[in-house]
């Protein structure tokens, strides 16, 4: 029995609605090819916090904190012949980072 190949697509963005929207679009495209889909699986959100001094010269105790969160989703696909062709035609926005592993 042959081992089936899996495609893992990881979506990353600072905007959670953008990640969710494009995860749904990818799933809709893949469903047209009759491939098996697992996901979107939400991965842990990482929050980055940066602390800076408010004043450039004095008042070391006066600081301000900035934070942003990076949201991730994972989609696993067991592809058919047309799945990869359909995924290559898909154009994603610049706000979403896509990582594809097989």
From Swiss-Prot:
Please report which protein family the annotation says this sequence is part of: Belongs to the universal ribosomal protein uS10 family.
**Biological role stated in the UniProt entry:** Involved in the binding of tRNA to the ribosomes.
Annotated Gene Ontology cellular components are: ribonucleoprotein complex; ribosome
Signal peptide start-end:
none
Name of the molecule in the record: Small ribosomal subunit protein uS10
Q: Which HAMAP family match?
A: Ribosomal_uS10
Native organism is Chlorobium phaeobacteroides (strain BS1)
Arranged from A to Z, the UniProt key words for this protein are: Ribonucleoprotein, Ribosomal protein
The UniProt subunit note reads as follows: Part of the 30S ribosomal subunit.
Record-level GO BP terms: translation
GO molecular function terms noted in the UniProt entry: structural constituent of ribosome; tRNA binding
InterPro entries (alphabetical)? Ribosomal_uS10, Ribosomal_uS10_CS, Ribosomal_uS10_dom, Ribosomal_uS10_dom_sf
């Amino acid at each position: 029995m042959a081992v089936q190949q899996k495609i893992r697509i990881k979506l990353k963005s600072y905007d959670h609605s953008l990640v969710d929207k494009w995860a749904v679009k990818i799933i809709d495209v893949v469903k047209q090819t009759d491939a098996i889909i697992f996901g979107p699986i939400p991965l842990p959100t990482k929050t980055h916090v940066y602390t800076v001094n408010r004043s450039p010269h004095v008042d070391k105790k006066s600081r301000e904190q900035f934070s942003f969160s990076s949201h991730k989703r994972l989609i696993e696909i067991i592809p058919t012949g047309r799945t990869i062709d359909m995924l290559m035609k898909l154009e994603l926005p610049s706000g979403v980072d896509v990582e594809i592993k097989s």
